Amino acid sequence: MNKETGMLKPWIEAQARLVEVAAGRAPADLVIRGGQWVNVHTREVIPGMDVAVADGRVAYVGPDAGPSVGPGTQVIEADGRFMVPGLIDAHMHVESGMLTPAGFAAAVIPHGTTTIFHDPHEIANVLGLEGVRLMRDESLLQPISMFTQMPSCAPSAPGLETTGQPITEGEVAQAMGWDGIVGLGEMMNFPGVASGDRQMLTEIAATRAAGKTVGGHYASPDLGRPFHAYVAGGANDDHETTTEAQGIARVRQGMGCMMRLGSAWYDVESQITAITEKGLDPRFFILCTDDSHSGTLVNDGHMNRVVRHAVDCGCDPLVAIQMATINAASHFGLERELGSITPGRRADVILTSDLRSLPIETVIAQGVVVAETGKLLVDCPRIAWPEAARDSVHLGRSLTGADFAVRATGDSARVRVIGVVENQAPTRALTAQLPIRDGVVEPQGETCHIALVERHRGTGGVVNGFVSGFGYQGRMAVASTVAHDSHHMIVVGTDRDSMAAAANHLGRIGGGVTVFRDGEELATVALPIAGLMSDRPAAEVAEAAQGIVKAMQDCGCTLNNAYMQHSLLALVVIPELRISDLGIVDVTRFELVDLMV
């Protein structure tokens, strides 16, 4: 680390000093003494080892770093604790935490995360390429390594939704030349790739030509020809796998299988048996979070939580650590830069007293002690977010309860219903026979109203449908401008007037999530940046977000982390049934369908 600029020197600029420190001819900046070295290259623990660090990089790992200790060297006594490489999240979306990159970094550093690969396709759908640049700019300022993937699909499914700012193949090619861009974000338009869509293939080709990694997203159980065509199209990984067979299929075809444990996704347990029971080589299995709520980050952890979960599922702790360090680094071609405690790599080290429960006691990132016993010790710099990023909710008019009415004739109607599945991203395509009163289809039982309100161009458009699985009761509504992936406004409720009140409230405050009951506000978390993020500290955002969760529960919701489920109801690239600004989407067939059956 350059003490004057705070920036990590490239290895080539640090090489000569690393040699001198390793040889004991020059003092190190930092020495960790007397630790148990977790070597992820050999999958072994070697006791009685020291680590010497210079210019933010590991210079020496061996039994005696004494010759590298000078008057100005910071010495940390490991006292027999394990020295673990800093943890890596190989696939995630910063915006899901309702935080900017600075806020996210501040939240996860105390949990031992020192590297993040993030795909800002949420803000890309609202602000386009400029939104990506802003996320990249703030990421580069952080004391940990935050690599940005250029979003590939905005909109995620052309013809099935309308985004705020579409991303073009020319913009993808342009971004591949930016500092901090490590590859292409998840290629969600898997039918497009499999059918040879020119734009999708051009984006992938531009990424591969730049020598960078293509993120995958094949959200279909079909492992036949469409799957093989998608793999042949160039995607390098996939995090949408939910079963052992799906994960194995990816790895057999040369992809990385990214097993996720987010706030609402619990896909590790069902896939890790490929390693723990079938004994497959774990090199191409990688751990990630995908989407983590701010409350999860503050209260439960980040990648340390994922590693612990993998161990609880029967995984060898050393294998679990490999899947959250060297496997991820290797996947992105960065194994010579990070992912292990070895010479030349970024000095990202965790000190912990137990590999199974993984308490994070000391965190070192790029040679700097950044956290100690859960306390952040460094600043996470922020950019000045422009006014355009803070003025992104345009409803065009004030909404009324009548806007959320589904009109029909007769005594009852059979309608399509989006069935939410707890702890899973996919939904079920259900139907229900609902009563008609005064010409309006009324929800009953488990079924609620759902509506998508256009918020990018101020058209005043509202698309209505029905959803089940939340368990809501009474006269209530939840509204959110976090609505993957095009991020219009999603409103779910049992009462149309409460739905209108909630939607109008978010229009006034510039975005966020709110819960109304009997027409009155119960809880709100304001997200003024693109309607997706707050620039407040993580703990403050988490507290407000917890208020949302509690308000949902007070309205009868029984789902685990219902907010995350709520935010995905418009995600038209994950089966089976979704809602968009263009209508109801059958994702299994990738086509718009009538609400009425």
UniProtKB/Swiss-Prot annotation:
Keywords linked to the UniProt accession: Hydrolase, Manganese
Q: Does the keyword rRNA-binding apply?
A: no
Q: Which GO terms describe its biological process?
A: adenine catabolic process
Write down the CDD domains for this protein, in alphabetical order.
Answer: AdeC
Give the EC number: 3.5.4.2
Q: Which Pfam families match?
A: Adenine_deam_C, Amidohydro_1
Annotated InterPro entries: Adenine_deam (IPR006679), Adenine_deam_C (IPR026912), Amidohydro-rel (IPR006680), Metal-dep_hydrolase_composite (IPR011059), Metal_Hydrolase (IPR032466)
Asked whether the UniProt record includes Hydrolase among its keywords, one would answer yes
Under the GO molecular function aspect, what terms does this record hold? adenine deaminase activity
Q: Which cofactor does it need?
A: Mn(2+)
UniProt catalytic activity: adenine + H2O + H(+) = hypoxanthine + NH4(+)
Instruction: Say which family it is in.
Output: Belongs to the metallo-dependent hydrolases superfamily. Adenine deaminase family.
User: What name does the UniProt record give this protein?
Assistant: Adenine deaminase
Supply the source organism for this entry. Paracoccus denitrificans (strain Pd 1222)
Gene symbol of the encoding locus: ade
